[in-house]
């Protein structure tokens, strides 16, 4: 079999782009908790001592945005001014407008209802909030049906945050990144080739101490022992020093970690980010639906790997296209799988929102460590409740 390497990365909740994502989703959750029908497109920019929140929000409630921002920053761990970013003292600026009425009229009443193609009741008067394509993916490499490299990178990033917050490693600061290179024998993971951990730290801690702790208390604590061998490389803070970090070291923006948020590069991406967007935005809801579909296809045994593409036009409820690729692993043809998908999944925005119960404040928890394959969270798009029906209708035992 051919041997090949594949690499994926993750970042901790203290990474500046993830700080921005979490602020945007914390604001979204705070609004949805009071007004589930709100329209939210919330973008965040963070830099040294400053948070700027902008976007378009239409809702029937009041949310204290600066308070939400500060609470989120403090929860992440930026609690002292010497970190260059502190939730108590940073400036918070807001520039919020209402959703464009031109967009709203397309979302509020879908094209099919206007032209009589279907009843307004059937589509719940919701058209897609924008055009675009979204991808979902699943593979049988891991129990959560995610690619192994991104799964391991997220697991290490969560562990890195855990040892900081619990004091197991008391010199760490919030910013950090992980990266895992997995060697494949054909399509099966065979070993871990390279592990990279970069973590912000107290200025007086030496690199050898950091290296020892990161290998023993982070990497080897969570990586599968059977995949680590004497040739596995561990690269810890390769530059030698990582004291200045977080928004003080790099500006952060909502939506700049879309590959970390999804499949670590193992599948294609439509380009749309998730955080700060209410579920009428198909960038988010349809990407969740595509994952839900792909995961159920793999869980049903219809394929070992499955990538689903959905595409939408603004103001139109039904997807303009549904595409499936199983990379030669299908137990049935891709055409049969598409037919099963069309019969078992309602992929109109209203149908997605209803079936996955997306008008709830459930988004902040997804804004770090990935939106998919999260055994630590109860996410509706990770459910495999359609697998039995798909398997039965496909005629598989």
Curated annotation (Swiss-Prot):
UniProt remark on cofactor binding: Binds 2 divalent ions per subunit. Binds 1 potassium ion per subunit.
Subcellular location as annotated: Cytoplasm
Keywords: ATP-binding, Cytoplasm, Magnesium, Metal-binding, Nucleotide-binding, One-carbon metabolism, Potassium, Transferase
Biological processes, Gene Ontology terms: one-carbon metabolic process; S-adenosylmethionine biosynthetic process
Protein residues bound to K(+): 43
InterPro entries membership: ADOMET_SYNTHASE_CS, S-AdoMet_synt_C, S-AdoMet_synt_central, S-AdoMet_synt_N, S-AdoMet_synthetase, S-AdoMet_synthetase_sfam
Gene3D superfamilies attached to this UniProt entry: 3.30.300.10
Catalytic activity: L-methionine + ATP + H2O = S-adenosyl-L-methionine + phosphate + diphosphate
Region described as Flexible loop: spans on this chain: 99-109
Binding-site list for L-methionine: 56, 99, 250, 281
Pathway where this protein functions: Amino-acid biosynthesis; S-adenosyl-L-methionine biosynthesis; S-adenosyl-L-methionine from L-methionine: step 1/1
Catalytic EC class: transferase
Subunit structure: Homotetramer; dimer of dimers.
Protein family: Belongs to the AdoMet synthase family.
Protein name: S-adenosylmethionine synthase
